[in-house]
C-alpha cells in the first residue's frame, strides 16, 4: 500500500492486497472520482437555483484534512481524518487539502499534500509526496500543501463552498484560506452536500460495512463466551478490543460502553472498570472500524450465562420492540417515524411488564416510554458512528442508507415506582441496517447472538 494510506495496515478477510486501482481497500480511483463528480453536479444544481449569475460564476470547493493533534508534548493522539476529505479523496494523511474548481460546475480536482521530508519521515514514517499522491488517487494536478494559498489566489473563485465557522484544520485555514475569504466571495456551506452524498452507500461501501459487522459479531461471541460471575468490565473491554483486531478490524470505532448491573442505566458510561457481579447483566455497546467504515452494535447478557426470570422478561420486551422497529426499515419511512413507533411499542411493553399500570392512558404510557428510554431509536451510520449529522432524521429513508435500530429500557436501582425485580436492570439491543429496494432490510449485524437462546448458547461456548 502507498505510504499515504498506512492507517490500520491492510488486514482482514475482505482484501489481502490493495490492487493498483484501489485508493483504499475495496474502493477504487473510479469510485472516488465519481464521488467528486456527483458533488460537482449537486453544486451545479444549487448554482442554477441561485440564478444565471451564480451558474456562470467560478466555483471553488475547499476541503481540508485534519491536523495531527497532541495529547502532550511530542505524543500524538491516533490520527483521525476529516471524513468529508477522506470520502472525496481516500487520503489518510494530515495537513492536506482538496480543491475543486470550475465555472458553474467545479469538476476539476487539485490535491495538496505535504512535501517529502526525510528528517520528518525518519520519525513519522514515509510520506507519498506529490508523485505518490497522484499515482494513488489518479488526480493529475497535485501541489505541496504550502502552495495552497497561492493556488487559491490564482483561481479567483467568486463562489466558495467551504465550512469555515469551525475549520477542521485551523492552521491551514488561517494561513491559506482566510485571505481568500477576506476578498469577499460568496461563501456557502459544503457539509450539507457532502453528507447527502455520504448517506447513500455504494455496493462497495456496503461490502466494507458488512465485513465490519461480521468482525464485530465474532468479537461479541468470543466476549460472551469468556463471561463469568464477578468479572471485571475492563477484562470484557480488552477481550472485545482484542477479538475485533484479531478478526481483521483496524481498531475500535469508539470507546465502548461495558456497563455491568445498574451502570447500564448510564447511557454513555465508558469507565469500564468495575466488577460485574454474579447474577448481573452487562451491556456492551461497541463497534470496529474496517478500512474507514464502522459498526455500532449493542447486546446485553448475564455474565453467569443464564437470564433470571426478571432479566428475561425485560429483555424479551425490548427484543419485541426492536423486531417491530426493524420491520419498518424500508424506503420512504423516516427514523423519526420509527422512533414514534418505538415509543408506542415500549409503552405497550411497560404496561405488560407492570412497570406502569395496565390502566395507564396512551399519552401517559408514551411519557413513561420517554422516561425509561430517553434516547432516539437510531442514527445514520457509515464512515462515522453518528454519521452525516447534517441529515434530518425526519428525512425519508432511501435504498443505500445505513442506520442503527437500538431501543432500550433502563430501570434505575433506586426507582421505587417499578416492581422490585426490575430495579437496577438496563437493556439495549442494537443492530446495523442497510435500507434496500426490497421490503426486507439488510441486517449487517445479523451474526451477533440476539435471542435469549442464542445468547445463552454463546455464553456457554467458553
Feature-to-residue mapping (PLM):
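Active-site neighborhoods and metal-handling regions in enzymes and metal-associated proteins
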Residues: 1-462
Amino acid at each position: 500500500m502507498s505510504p499515504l494510506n498506512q492507517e490500520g495496515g491492510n488486514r482482514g478477510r475482505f482484501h489481502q492486497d490493495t490492487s493498483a486501482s484501489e485508493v483504499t481497500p475495496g474502493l477504487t480511483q473510479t469510485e472516488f472520482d465519481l464521488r467528486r463528480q456527483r458533488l460537482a453536479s449537486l453544486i451545479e444544481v444549487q448554482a442554477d437555483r441561485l440564478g444565471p449569475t451564480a451558474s456562470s460564476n467560478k466555483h471553488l470547493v475547499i476541503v481540508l484534512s485534519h491536523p495531527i493533534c497532541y495529547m502532550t508534548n511530542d505524543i500524538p493522539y491516533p490520527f483521525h481524518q476529516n471524513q468529508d476529505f477522506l470520502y472525496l479523496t481516500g487520503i489518510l494523511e494530515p495537513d492536506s487539502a482538496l480543491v475543486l474548481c470550475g465555472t458553474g460546475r467545479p469538476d476539476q480536482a487539485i490535491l495538496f499534500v505535504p512535501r517529502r521530508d526525510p528528517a520528518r519521515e525518519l520519525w513519522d514514517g514515509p510520506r507519498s509526496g506529490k508523485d505518490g499522491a497522484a499515482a494513488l488517487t489518479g488526480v493529475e494536478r497535485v501541489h505541496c500543501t504550502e502552495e495552497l494559498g497561492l493556488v487559491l489566489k490564482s483561481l479567483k473563485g467568486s463562489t466558495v463552498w467551504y465550512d469555515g465557522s469551525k475549520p477542521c484544520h485551523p492552521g491551514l485555514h488561517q494561513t491559506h484560506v482566510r485571505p481568500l475569504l477576506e476578498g469577499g466571495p460568496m461563501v456557502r456551506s459544503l457539509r450539507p452536500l457532502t453528507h447527502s452524498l455520504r448517506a447513500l452507500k455504494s455496493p462497495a461501501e456496503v461490502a466494507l460495512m458488512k465485513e465490519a459487522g461480521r468482525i464485530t459479531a465474532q468479537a461479541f461471541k468470543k466476549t460472551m463466551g469468556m463471561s463469568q460471575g464477578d468479572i471485571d468490565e475492563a477484562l470484557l473491554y480488552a477481550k472485545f478490543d482484542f477479538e475485533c483486531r484479531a478478526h481483521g478490524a483496524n481498531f475500535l470505532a469508539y470507546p465502548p460502553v461495558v456497563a455491568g448491573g445498574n451502570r447500564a442505566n448510564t447511557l454513555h458510561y465508558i469507565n469500564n472498570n468495575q466488577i460485574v457481579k454474579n447474577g448481573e447483566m452487562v451491556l456492551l455497546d461497541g463497534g470496529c472500524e474496517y478500512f474507514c467504515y464502522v459498526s455500532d452494535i449493542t447486546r446485553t447478557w448475564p455474565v453467569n450465562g443464564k437470564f433470571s426470570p426478571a432479566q428475561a422478561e425485560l429483555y424479551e420486551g425490548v427484543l419485541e420492540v426492536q423486531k417491530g422497529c426493524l420491520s419498518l426499515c424500508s424506503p420512504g419511512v423516516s427514523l423519526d417515524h420509527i422512533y414514534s413507533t418505538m415509543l408506542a411499542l415500549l409503552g405497550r411493553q411497560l404496561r405488560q411488564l407492570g412497570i406502569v399500570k395496565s390502566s395507564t392512558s396512551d399519552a401517559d404510557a408514551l411519557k413513561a416510554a420517554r422516561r425509561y428510554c430517553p434516547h432516539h431509536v437510531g442514527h445514520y451510520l457509515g464512515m462515522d458512528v453518528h454519521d452525516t449529522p447534517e441529515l434530518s432524521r425526519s428525512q425519508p429513508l432511501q435504498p443505500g442508507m445505513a442506520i442503527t435500530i437500538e431501543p432500550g429500557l433502563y430501570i434505575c436501582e433506586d426507582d421505587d415506582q417499578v416492581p422490585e425485580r426490575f430495579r437496577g436492570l438496563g437493556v439495549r439491543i442494537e443492530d446495523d441496517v442497510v435500507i434496500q429496494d426490497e421490503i426486507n432490510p439488510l441486517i449487517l449485524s445479523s451474526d451477533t447472538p440476539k435471542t435469549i437462546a442464542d445468547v445463552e448458547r454463546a455464553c456457554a461456548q467458553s
